[in-house]
Amino acid sequence: MKSKFQKIKGTYDILPPESKKWNTAISILQSLSEQFGYEEIKTPIIENIDLFKQNIGYETDVSKEMFSWEDPSGNQLVLKPEMTAPVVRAYIESGFFRSKPLCKLFYIDALFRREKPQKGRQRQFHQFGIEALGSSEVEQDVEVILLATKILCHLG
């Protein structure tokens, strides 16, 4: 029987047994990131639109594909389309740049883009990433590559 209510096109449900695989993958990502000294960061799902427009550009695909609206107070808001800008905003706003010369962060979060749904492209998707803020050392790049290699080996 077809339900009157359907998930929104471009979104998906993570159902058993897939949810068990999903949670296993998340545990591996968290564990390996922490072994390398990265700490998890969570940022709000809603951000000010200017955070993205000013940082990734007004004419980029991401800017054109944001789910945005104006709240009753006139603020232009957006569902997060990517993670680097919110991570850097939190890094600066929290003062971590003063207290942690090298701030190693990782995230696993849901993101949203108003893309035309097709194979490999969803309106809601999840992203894992790491950010090493405050270092321009090549050794930091090597560490990121090593971590990525370990993750790929563990996930198969």
What residue ranges belong to the model's regions?
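TRNA-recognition modules of translation machinery and tRNA-sensing kinases, especially anticodon-binding
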Residues: 1-156
